[in-house]
Amino acid sequence: MLEEKFLDLLAQKYDSEEKVVTEIINLEAILDLPKGTEHFVSDLHGEYQAFQHVLRNGSGKVKEKIRDIFKHELSEKEINEFATLIYYPEEKLQLIRNQFDNKQELNAWYTKTIDQMIRLIPYASSKYTRTKLRKALPKQFVYIIEELLYKTDEYTNKKHYYSKIVQKVISLGQADKLIIGLAYTTQQLVVDHLHVVGDIYDRGPEPDKIMEALINYHSLDIQWGNHDVLWIGAFSGSKVCLANILRICARYDNLDIIEDVYGINLRPLLNLAEKYYKDNPAFRPKRHSNKKLSDQEQSQITKIHQAIAMIQFKLEMPIIKRRPYFNMSKRLLLEKVDYENNKITIDGKTYPLENTCFATVNPDQPDELLEEEKQVMDKLLFSVQHSEKLARHMEFLMKKGTLYLRYNGNLLIHGCIPIDENGNMEKMFIENKTYAGRELLDIFENYLLHAFSNREATDDLATDMVWYLWTGEYSSLFGKREMTTFERYFIKDKALHKERKNPYYYLREKEGICRMILEEFDLDPDQGHIINGHTPVKEIEGENPIKANGKMIVIDGGFSKAYQPTTGIAGYTLLYNSFGMQLVAHQHFNSKEDVLQNGNDVLSVKRLVDEELERKKISETNIGEKLIEDINMLNSLLKYRYLK
């Protein structure tokens, strides 16, 4: 009965036998096309400039296509110039126009360049239907471009007609707009789908611009990282997540993200900080090489940093106490401080404290917030939850994001799957029930969704669980035994700063472990891979990003400048097309200007991870599964409505 109702509804769209048959033929044909190119990036950490370059060049795919077509016509220098025009059309056109003294020479350049771009588009779109290509073309030029794309030299009757179209575009002053449109179309055609494997946010200065770029991207999904979840948590009502964000922004001198970008007023926090705190070397912001700070600004940030860190430590304590199964009582450090002698006892050993800032702490009840601190946090939370721009970014993050993704036979995950040293899934006890493996990640995601849709609740289990995802030992995003923030600020002994990683991080080198994890997520261990972000690959020390006989691929894009000295390169991205998987290593990205002026690209080498024996078709992908369902439904409609 229900199926008949659905078929009646479907018949409104396909109201003739011809329409149904045409759609079935169309979908069956699409199933036979090669799968599109997937592009995997990870750990963007707010570094917009480096990220958008990788997005524009498709991790080298754009230049590869240019080279395939023009290798016998253009020199290496000309190929680089052409590639730069496709990456940054507006800026490159400006530079090129300035090189010409007369209009004739410029027009000749326009004619040649438009012709080259029109030749590149069919090659870049060879895996797509005409309908899909039409959707990617710049709207105002669709008719003109299609005329130029589908010309054939079989008959020469139209040669003059095609030439006239291009000359008219130039004489009407539309050449720049056409070239810009074709450049962005090429960028879009080269990558069919983007996977962002976590951490859009962190210490970098422009996560908001990354979010805007992703919102405008044609096709993508996101696997949340630990820093993304922190921002989602703050927006969902978690004051302790909010305190963490503010502390990290103060530490890395990025408070303008909070104030200027998202419009959140920090004046109440500054007033509190000025009242209770002084200069403190442990809390001075990390300097940006390209950003000057006055002494007064440094002093204000140092005080804000202390104020919000102390609020954070206080806010953590009630959560730890009301959720004993978080197993975090060791983190109740403010209760272990000897305030008179400035010492702390941890695991039976006493350590001196330095650079302390306990002015607002009541030694008898260390988790007690001052009335002023409560008011400041209430105001900040209100501002965060009423920031229009932040709401748009967080809603997009939730709409496109998941904790893990099963896609085309692979498992995409930012952090880890918590396992013990014997390789068994670690169990977590929540509300009288035990969870492990995929079930644990599913329950984490349920709590996150619940917290996001109930933002007025600030201390329910769902909101507490979002904070646990940031810092808890069984969190798939944190993947360490404890977070030693307090120790790093106040205790000199480096042994206490160490954060022990989950055994996953050394066991993922073993093929057997990776196969077990793939099976846990109902994926074929012979065909599937785990694609993992979160940890920088220390190439400098000989670490290999391809592990476990090719079953595990670690791609930290290395966009965060802070980690680059430890990795030796900037990082890795991954491409997966119908021929197989390629890992792309990136050098440091200097600046857009460097690319424009010198054609310097940041790609170095590509390594083959896996080669398909036969080209993979759309029928073997997630999209293919959906199309097969549609075809079955249309066949049912055909029988039900038209073949009776």
UniProtKB/Swiss-Prot annotation:
EC number: 3.1.3.11
UniProt gene name: fbp
Protein family according to the UniProt entry: Belongs to the FBPase class 3 family.
Pathway connected to this protein: Carbohydrate biosynthesis; gluconeogenesis
Keyword vocabulary terms for this entry: Carbohydrate metabolism, Hydrolase, Manganese
Entry-linked InterPro entries: FBPtase_class3, Metallo-depent_PP-like
First-level EC class: hydrolase
Positions of transmembrane segments: none
Keyword Protease listed: no
Protein known as: Fructose-1,6-bisphosphatase class 3
Cofactor: Mn(2+)
Key word Manganese present: yes
GO biological process, one term: gluconeogenesis
MF (Gene Ontology): fructose 1,6-bisphosphate 1-phosphatase activity
Reactions catalysed: beta-D-fructose 1,6-bisphosphate + H2O = beta-D-fructose 6-phosphate + phosphate
